[in-house]
Regions:
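Conserved catalytic network of the ASCE P-loop NTPase/AAA+ motor domain
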Residues: 78, 100-101, 160-163, 210-214, ...
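Conserved nucleotide-binding/hydrolysis micro-motifs of P-loop NTPases
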Residues: 6-11, 90-93, 111-115, 174-177, ...
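Walker A/P-loop NTP-binding active-site region of P-loop NTPases
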Residues: 56-114, 182-186
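Phosphate/Mg2+-binding loops and adjacent switch elements
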Residues: 129-226, 231-234
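C-terminal lobe/tail of nucleotide-utilizing enzymes
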Residues: 1-52, 211, 215, 226-259
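Short, structured motif recognition centered on aromatic/hydrophobic residues
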Residues: 54-59, 67, 72-76, 84-87, ...
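Basic, amphipathic N-terminal segments
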Residues: 18, 27-29, 121-125, 129, ...
């Protein structure tokens, strides 16, 4: 038994009913005019030409963001650029693909480690000026669910700060997780100040840096399928609202160039 390949998206009852039929409906002829689709090297050369320092790969889960991030980082490295490749995705695949001999500087946000270190830092500062009930209140406050998000956010800001000295390529988690991180920048900064008493420079500079189109670019990664494309369209709208630049879409598994 096998499921045949059909030249249409199997969405809706009508398409489900005809999926396994021997006789398939005739399809209208598609305009097969050859178009010039730039290759990924064109995108990378544009990043170099425009002096981008922070490059995100974003899109739905499973569209190939990690693979694209690695290709971009390796290509920039071949052009003599100092590159740091990072991932905010809890499913860290960078080491699996690259190993220890890639020559790239790698980092991964380990949520449990970041949470532990953030708690230790806040409590250490609290011990210097507090005791008794006040200290217990701070300790209890750190058990709130948002503490882990703040710890991850702080680590994210520290990764972005590396762009002072090198190009940072960031392989992001699936769309929703990343947008939450970006959209909450200001509120997280206030929460960091409330709990630790100060806002690190990396966090102060984060939002202006992400919104600087001369420095930051989002490379949208998708597949030639309905759901990934619609999700990328929604992502584009969200990025527009956040004032974060996105010029390029990279479509994986596309057969358009084979005509």
């Amino acid at each position: 038994f096998f499921i045949p390949l059909r030249p249409y998206n199997v969405t809706g009852l009508d398409k489900l009913r005809i999926l396994l039929d021997t006789v398939q409906p005739e399809l209208p002829e598609i305009d097969s005019e050859m178009r010039e689709y730039p290759e990924i090297s064109t995108v990378i050369n544009n990043f170099v030409k425009t002096g981008k320092k922070i490059i995100f790969t974003m899109g739905k889960g499973g569209v190939g963001k990690t693979t694209v991030a690695i290709k971009v980082a390796q290509a920039l490295q071949k052009q003599g650029k100092k590159v740091h490749l990072a991932t905010t995705d809890p499913a860290d695949h960078l080491n699996f693909y690259l190993g220890a001999t890639s020559g790239l500087s790698l980092s991964h946000i380990d949520e449990e480690k970041e949470l532990r270190e953030y708690k230790e830092e806040v409590l250490s500062k609290a011990r210097e000026t507090m005791s008794g009930d006040d200290f217990d209140y701070v300790k209890e406050d750190l058990e709130s669910p948002c503490t882990q998000e703040i710890a991850v956010f702080r680590a994210f800001a520290e990764i972005v700060e590396k762009a002072d000295d090198e190009i940072v390529v960031i392989d992001t988690a699936p769309t929703g997780h990343t947008l939450l991180l970006l959209e909450s920048t200001q509120s997280y900064a206030k929460e960091v100040e409330r709990t630790s008493g100060e806002v690190p420079k990396s966090i102060q500079k984060l939002l202006p840096r992400l919104q600087n189109s001369d420095e930051t670019e989002v490379l949208m990664v998708t597949l030639p399928e309905t759901t990934p494309v619609y999700e990328s369209m929604r992502l584009a709208d969200d990025l527009d609202r956040a004032h974060i630049a996105h010029t390029w879409w990279l479509v994986n598994q596309s057969m358009s160039a084979t005509h």
